[in-house]
């Protein structure tokens, strides 16, 4: 660990001691808001304190074992204890470094998943359907809930476009690096001569905003359309124009919702998603600017960026943002086994963040 990172850890340890003193102050205890805020900050620093205490014990164990190494009768045991202590210190070093990475406050929250067919006609729509099913099955493995808010089926299967809300603790933290253009290479079912076709679909991961009520939108900037659709209301929604399409004219952002029985409920859902998308657009611009400055690939937030290729003939998935990230496990991944892929992306992002922290004073 670099000296800079070590100094940051020491600062966190000192802040923890300060918080412990503050939380015993009667004035702080008597102020519910302040007490709650400081208690939350203290709980976030506890893992750092625990890891530092474990590190101190491991260093003491190492020193004791090294002192015993000079004793011929204890040398073999000492060597074993030295190896164990060094291995533990390496683990703790990595753990402490990861605890330094600033936590995204949105990580535990829900998200909106948007998948749209790109170039490739019917095959692109089928691929968009495959991607949506991949994420839905991954969500099921995680115990999350997937609620479709709007969809436009492809003529030969899949989706021209599908939007869903993914509900579950940690959903955004696991899927936030999936935004971008996904490309597929395979022989379509309709291809009689066995030629490989290339098509694409785009994925957008938008965190559900907790503070959407604080976002003010001028009603004059909105164009609201109603239409008939099928959905949760069954035949009822086919008879009434309960589905809602809202266009935010200044930005061009369009959202739809057609899953509820009433127009009012669909409008409420659509407005929440619109506000979340506008907020995410601003954050994405900032993330993209930072990524450009720091030459980052993972976490850039650029949805036009080609991030991944799925080569069915070779059973291979390549993520273009991380050098050497190619997995020959496409059949399982497309069925929702995304942990290995997501784990590599999270590790790369953590490395980027640690590099930034090391460069900062």
Swiss-Prot record:
GO cellular component terms listed in the entry, alphabetical order: cytoplasm
Posttranslational mods: Methylated by PrmC. Methylation increases the termination efficiency of RF1.
Region named Disordered: 288-307
Classification lineage: Bacteria, Pseudomonadati, Pseudomonadota, Gammaproteobacteria, Lysobacterales
Protein name (database record): Peptide chain release factor 1
InterPro entries xrefs: PCRF (IPR005139), Pep_chain_release_fac_I (IPR000352), Pep_chain_release_fac_I_sf (IPR045853), Prokaryotic/Mito_RF (IPR050057), RF-1 (IPR004373)
Function: Peptide chain release factor 1 directs the termination of translation in response to the peptide chain termination codons UAG and UAA.
Disulfide bonds: none
Family annotation (PANTHER family): LD18447P
Location of N5-methylglutamine modifications: 235
SMART domains: PCRF (SM00937)
Domain of life: Bacteria
Subcellular location: Cytoplasm
Organism: Xanthomonas axonopodis pv. citri (strain 306)
């Amino acid at each position: 660990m670099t000296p800079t990172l070590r100094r940051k850890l020491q600062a966190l340890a000192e802040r923890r001691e300060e918080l412990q003193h503050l939380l015993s102050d009667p004035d702080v205890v008597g102020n519910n808001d302040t007490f709650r805020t400081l208690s939350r900050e203290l709980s976030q620093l506890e893992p750092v304190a625990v890891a530092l205490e474990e590190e101190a014990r491991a260093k003491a164990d190492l020193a004791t074992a090294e002192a015993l190494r000079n004793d011929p009768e204890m040398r073999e045991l000492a060597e074993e204890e030295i190896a164990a202590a060094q291995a533990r210190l390496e683990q703790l070093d990595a753990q402490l470094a990861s605890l330094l990475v600033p936590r995204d406050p949105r990580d535990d929250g829900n998200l909106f998943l948007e998948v749209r067919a790109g170039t490739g006609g019917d095959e692109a729509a089928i691929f968009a359907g495959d991607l949506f099913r991949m994420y839905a099955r991954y969500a099921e493995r995680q115990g999350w809930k997937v609620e479709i808010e709007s969809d436009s089926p492809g003529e030969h299967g899949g989706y021209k476009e599908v939007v869903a809300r993914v509900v579950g603790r940690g959903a955004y933290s696991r899927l936030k690096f999936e935004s971008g253009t996904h490309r597929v290479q395979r022989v379509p079912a309709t291809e009689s001569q066995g030629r490989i076709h290339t098509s694409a679909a785009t994925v957008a991961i938008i965190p559900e905003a907790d503070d959407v009520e604080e976002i003010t939108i001028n009603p004059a900037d909105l164009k609201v359309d109603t239409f008939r659709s099928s959905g949760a209301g069954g035949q009822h929604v086919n008879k009434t124009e309960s589905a809602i399409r809202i266009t935010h004219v200044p930005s061009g952002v369009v959202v739809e919702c057609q899953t509820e029985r009433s127009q009012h409920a669909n409008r409420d859902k659509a407005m929440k998603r619109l506000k979340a998308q506008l907020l995410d657009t601003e954050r994405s611009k900032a993330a993209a600017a930072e990524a450009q400055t720091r030459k980052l690939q993972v976490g850039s937030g650029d949805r036009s960026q080609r991030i991944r290729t799925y080569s069915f003939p070779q059973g291979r998935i390549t993520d273009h943002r991380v050098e050497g990230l190619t997995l020959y496990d496409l059949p399982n991944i497309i069925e929702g086994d995304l942990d290995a892929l997501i784990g590599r992306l999270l590790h790369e992002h953590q490395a980027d963040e640690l590099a930034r922290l090391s460069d900062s004073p």
